[in-house]
């Protein structure tokens, strides 16, 4: 821990928040290579798994999903597809795998603030 540079940072300096390209469940295919993420808080936001749908809508592993109705952040360790009202949180820095739980906790501390914001303003 001596090599870590400790300090205060704005989350906007560490992460970008981006829209996801979404589609409905009727587009899903057989398979379990990808998670289909929705705005739910249940099951880490995973509604179901799917096979390959298309390249355009895939969100990268190593990001977080944010369901805009419950405002819950979940780390995604494999590529994923999104339903409506989901954003992706992309780190601007390299985050070691063993630090993802820490950052998930930090991001979820924003929930009370985000719940008071209109969904259309979360960007």
Question: Where in this protein do the model-derived segments appear?
Answer:
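Specificity-determining recognition surfaces
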Residues: 87-90, 104-123
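Short loop/beta submotifs within extracellular cysteine-rich repeat domains
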Residues: 19-22, 44-46, 73-74, 109-115
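Sequence-level detector for tyrosine residue identity
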Residues: 9, 34-36, 75, 81, ...
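Non-catalytic DNA-recognition/assembly elements of restriction-modification systems
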Residues: 1-44
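Short, recurring structural edge motifs at helix starts
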Residues: 1, 22-26, 92, 112-117
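Amphipathic alpha-helical segments
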Residues: 5, 99, 120-123
């Amino acid at each position: 821990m001596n090599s870590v540079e400790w300090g205060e940072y704005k989350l906007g300096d560490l992460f970008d928040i981006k829209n996801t390209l979404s589609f409905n469940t009727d587009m899903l295919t057989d398979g379990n290579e990808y998670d289909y993420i929705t705005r739910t808080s249940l099951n880490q936001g995973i509604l179901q798994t799917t096979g390959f749908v298309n390249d355009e809508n895939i969100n990268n592993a190593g990001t977080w999903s944010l369901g805009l109705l419950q405002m819950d952040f979940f780390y995604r360790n494999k590529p994923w597809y999104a339903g409506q009202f989901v954003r992706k949180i992309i780190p601007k820095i390299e985050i070691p795998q063993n630090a993802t739980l820490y950052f998930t906790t930090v991001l979820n501390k924003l929930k009370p603030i985000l719940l008071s914001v209109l969904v259309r303003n979360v960007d």
